[in-house]
Design a protein with these regions (language model features):
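Nucleic acid-processing catalytic cores of prokaryotic defense/repair systems
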Residues: 1-106, 113-116
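Activity-critical C-terminal alpha-helical subdomain
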Residues: 505-656
Length: 707
């Protein structure tokens, strides 16, 4: 069996939420205070009776609760579903809780925390109306009222099967579940230092003589093994008695016991020293140490990360022990569950990756842990998980807590799912944690976007720029290839038919990439001034049109932004189109010599523009003089012909020529150019009046994402 579903009603930040789980590993991610720990605590309340009412307070009720006409209740139901080839004991445990077959069995356990029917219940209903003003209850006063007069009278129950029947779950069967929760504030050192600790002692005791017994029951061992085990025990007893007698002779007991005679205590019997040592007694003396290059150091001097790993290993060993009927008989656990909060604590990225892989393999190889729950903020843990195992808690557009299942968001689109699984690395998986997402189509855009955002004020009064607000609103910028935007957008394609997707605000900033169809039938990129009214030309690339039709139109949380149709091309092209005469766009990535594209040559073209911005022929002439090879001249003739016949104004033609030349200079060095350009723009931002002009589509994208 496995926990396939949980419904949480009126518990902490969950007013009424349902979550689905996978059979093995479940990695629960989300922003701070999303409810990751609350979800684990809810499971614990159902399966761990020690954590029921004794740990609950009035603050565990959901504060969104508003209808106080009847006493508020906490209800948590988990669904246990049948697994293929599961152990026979599973069905025995849940038999009385089965609610149906579909086609495999489903069983249900429900934790309920409530005020029982009776005088107290009636008293509450009579008094609560005094806290009602204008048809609404005064929530804060009501919660204080409940805490003072009624909370101590609440009871906790766990029901099995159909909740309407209110049949209490058998306590003995509930004990078959072993729920181990390692919370974020775990003191690993304290838990495992000495052998007198419960976990360490139990593990040591179980593995005593394990090389002989192999964990089998005594009655199942061959006679020769039993004899060997008995000899070991007898030898230990003889040796321990010799050790004790040696110690006893060194103690002047008469000096100690004479006071007993003087006080008269000896009349009740003469005190003496005696002992019988067994293995269990000496286990108390054992302690964990770390040996490195022959040196022994105490566990307290070991790193926190490694101590956490050691502690987890001990817990896993303990869970193995408690599920062994050879050791515990009928008290053995049937369904061990391990929940770990923030396993990344004190672990470097490589260890995080390895740790989750180990835990998952422990389940997949049919280890003793049957189901694993992990809560994390780590993108490294997330990237190590299978996409189907990830559960994403987030705030929807309306501010409500929602749950997304990235592995289920793709529907039948296996190509997109496989692509995202392959490329959802530690960097890209940040999109699952952020409140809002900007997808850009290259590292240059990712590097430059924060700087471009700094040119606009979000809150002028408090001097907060859009760059500041991107951080304040937890917006992440992720670089993906333009033609693979659609794969990642499937994760966020949320509507009533696909609630597995994640309803976050997503903005895509992409290139227009105009294209023309060659005689060979292939589409190739072109400049806006080369476009003609023909089916052989597209002002927007086909993949950009698809993004707008397939994602922007049907999904309210997805928006696509690109350069102006018929005038724009790429971000670099737009920089010069909006700043044709500015030297800010010139960087050290330009060729230094032996090229028509040196800094000096481009400045000369800008001078022609600044002298007369309609003199496109002058710009063409100046550029033509710098060309030295036949190939350069051949390409230029094509450009010159197209610019002459296009319908742009003379000024727009001048800008188009400069934009085309600029694009050809930087297109093969986008990353390096972006690095230098960002440096130039940061200096410009320090000026009292920055001169650089941000492309309109970038402004619009930032306005959309920031609201």
């Amino acid at each position: 069996m496995y926990i396939s579903k949980i419904n949480i009603n009126n518990f902490r930040n969950f007013s009424n939420s349902t979550f689905e789980f996978t059979e093995g590993t479940n990695v629960i991610i989300g922003h701070n205070n999303a409810g990751k720990t609350n979800l684990i605590k809810a499971i614990q309340l159902v399966l761990d009776s020690r954590k029921s009412k004794s740990k609950l307070t009035v603050d565990d009720f959901c504060k969104q609760y508003s209808d106080f006409s009847t006493p508020p209740e906490i209800t948590i139901s988990i669904t246990l579903s049948e697994q293929t080839d599961e152990p026979a004991d599973d069905k025995v445990v849940v038999y009385d809780w089965i609610t149906g077959f579909n086609p495999k069995y489903e069983a249900q356990l429900t934790f309920s925390f409530f005020l029982p029917q009776g005088d107290d219940y009636d008293d509450y209903c009579n008094q609560i109306e005094h806290f009602k003003i204008g048809g609404n209850y005064e929530s804060e006063k009501v919660w204080r009222f409940i805490k003072k007069y009624f909370f101590s009278k609440y009871v906790a129950r766990v029901y099995g099967g159909d909740i309407d029947k209110k049949e209490s779950a058998d306590y003995e069967m509930l004990q078959k579940f072993d729920f181990q929760f390692l919370d974020a504030i775990r003191d690993a050192e304290k838990q495992m230092f000495f052998g007198n600790n419960t976990i360490l002692k139990e593990v040591l005791n179980y593995f005593l003589d394990f090389d002989i017994t192999d964990g089998k029951k005594l009655k199942d061992l061959p006679t020769q093994i039993k004899d060997k085990l008995r000899d070991k025990e007898n030898n230990f007893e003889d040796d321990s008695n010799k050790l004790f007698n040696q110690l006893k002779t060194r103690i002047s007991k008469n000096e100690i016991l004479k006071y007993a005679k003087e006080t008269g205590a000896s009349k009740g019997g003469i005190p003496d020293l005696d002992a019988h040592l067994n293995e269990d007694d000496l286990l108390f003396a054992l302690r964990l140490i770390i040996e490195i290059d022959g040196m022994k150091i105490p566990i307290s001097n070991n790193g926190l990360g490694y101590n956490n790993l050691l502690y987890t290993a001990l817990v896993l060993a303990k869970m193995q022990i408690e599920s062994q009927s050879s050791y515990y008989g009928e008290n053995a656990k049937v369904f061990p569950i391990l929940a770990i909060e923030e396993p990344e604590a004190h672990l470097h990225p490589s260890m995080q990756f390895k740790f989750l892989k180990f835990l998952s393999q422990n389940i997949n190889s049919k280890g003793k842990v049957r189901q694993l729950f992990v809560t994390t903020h780590s993108t490294h843990i997330t990237s190590a998980a299978e996409l189907d195992d990830v559960i994403c808690l987030y705030k929807g557009i309306n501010g409500n807590t929602k749950v997304g299942y990235p592995g289920k968001a793709f529907g039948k689109d296996e190509d997109s799912k496989n692509y995202v699984k392959r490329f959802l690395n530690a960097t890209k998986s940040n999109m699952l944690f952020a409140d809002k997402v900007i997808l850009v189509e290259g590292l240059a855009e990712q590097l430059l976007l924060p700087c471009l955002a700094a040119y606009e004020c979000y809150d002028a009064k408090n001097k907060i720029t859009n760059e500041d607000e991107l951080i304040n609103q937890h917006v992440c910028t992720v670089s993906v290839d333009s033609r693979t935007f659609s794969h990642f957008l499937r994760l966020f394609s949320y509507d009533e038919t696909n609630k597995n997707a994640i309803e976050k605000l997503v903005v895509c900033i992409t290139d227009a990439d105009p294209e023309s169809k060659g005689n060979d039938g292939k589409w190739r990129g072109c400049f806006p001034f080369e476009l003609k009214d023909s089916d052989k030309f597209n002002a927007l690339a086909s993949h950009v049109k698809s993004l707008k039709n397939d994602f922007e139109k049907p999904y309210r949380n997805i928006s696509i932004f690109h350069p102006e149709e018929k005038k724009g091309k790429t971000l670099e092209h737009e920089f010069i189109r909006y700043n044709p005469g500015s030297e800010l766009v010139i960087t050290k990535s330009f060729p230094s010599q032996n090229s028509p594209h040196t800094i000096e040559h481009f400045k000369a073209l800008q001078k022609v523009f600044n002298d007369n911005n309609e003199d496109f022929l002058g710009i063409i002439s100046a550029y033509e003089k710098t060309l030295t090879t036949d190939k350069q001249k051949e390409k230029f003739e094509k450009l010159k012909t197209s610019i002459n016949v296009c319908t742009f104004s003379n000024k727009d033609k001048s800008i188009a020529v400069l934009s085309a030349i600029y694009y050809n200079i930087v297109k093969s060095l986008k990353g390096e150019h972006a690095l230098y350009l960002e440096e130039c723009l940061r200096k410009d931002l320090d000026e009292s009046v920055p001169e650089f002009i941000i492309p309109t589509y970038v402004k619009d994208a930032l306005k959309k994402i920031l609201g």
